[in-house]
């Protein structure tokens, strides 16, 4: 896909994302955050000088990478780097936007910490299943693009925009941001219980209702348990629960339930998944 191949394009460079569960050996979290910030400087030194960099783009909570939240202190460092060099800080909220993390946008957590992004890219949940995407930015950034330069046949599609407006209405009317946080609280409590009980559950992390469970063969070595996750997906499907994997090693189950899910549905899913973990742990 274009999304997965974008880093291969000329002029696009990848820096390390803070994966604190798998931070470099021997480092404290504070030392690791410094290390990850310096990986940006390494790009400037080895690939492209800072004055030629237009933007730094990151997900507030990494999606395909394994549902890894960006540490706010690290984002503060990025904001400082961007301000020093005139670089735009762009939040890719295609997965994390529209209530998934307990706020309309996950980057609102950044804003509260004083490191607001310059631009937000969003799609997916924006229109409740109707194809729609959007770019949000400050007036001076949007006005810098000449009229007619960016557009497309279906830009401003009336049906999609109407769906997007209705989504915003429903989020506010049904208090879905509050519900997202409640779902997150329930799930984090349950998943952390599993972490305490099952050797195979290595890490639980997330924001709001967007949570990743990382499975390992051993909690000390943190060796990824990708095969276990593959079996878990099949075992759950056989019992009526659809789950999906993610992560660099394919060993993370990503939890991204609809914000309209009921507690009864949540508990039914928990029951199916925990019993599957129990059965597979005995193999």
Regions found by a protein language model. Give the residues of each.
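Conserved N-terminal phosphate-binding loop of PLP-dependent enzymes in the Aspartate aminotransferase
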Residues: 1-283
């Amino acid at each position: 896909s274009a999304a997965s191949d974008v880093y291969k394009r000329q002029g696009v460079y990848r820096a390390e994302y803070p994966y604190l569960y798998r931070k470099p050996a021997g480092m404290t979290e504070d030392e690791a955050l410094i290390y990850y910030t310096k990986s940006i400087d390494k790009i400037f030194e080895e690939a492209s000088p800072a004055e030629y960099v237009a933007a730094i783009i990151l997900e507030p909570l990494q999606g395909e990478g394994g549902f890894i939240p960006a540490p706010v202190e690290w984002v503060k460092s990025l904001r400082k780097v961007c301000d020093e060099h005139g670089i735009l800080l762009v939040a890719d909220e295609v997965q994390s936007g529209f209530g998934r993390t307990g706020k309309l946008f996950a980057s609102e957590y950044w804003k509260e910490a004083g490191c607001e992004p310059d631009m937000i890219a969003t799609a997916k949940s924006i229109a409740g299943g109707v194809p729609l995407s959007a770019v949000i930015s400050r007036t001076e950034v949007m006005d810098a693009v000449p009229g007619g330069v960016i557009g497309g046949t279906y830009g401003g599609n009336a049906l999609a925009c109407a769906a997007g407006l209705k989504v915003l209405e429903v989020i506010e009317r049904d208090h879905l941001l509050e519900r997202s946080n409640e779902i997150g609280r329930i799930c984090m409590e349950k998943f952390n219980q599993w972490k305490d009980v099952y050797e195979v559950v290595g890490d639980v992390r997330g924001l709001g209702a967007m949570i990743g469970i990382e499975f390992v063969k051993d909690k000390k070595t943190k060796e990824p348990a990708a095969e276990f996750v593959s079996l878990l997906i099949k075992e759950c499907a056989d019992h009526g629960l659809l789950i999906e994997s993610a992560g660099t090693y394919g060993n993370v189950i990503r939890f991204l339930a609809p914000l309209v899910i009921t507690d009864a549905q949540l508990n039914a899913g928990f029951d199916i998944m925990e019993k599957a973990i129990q059965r597979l742990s005995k193999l």
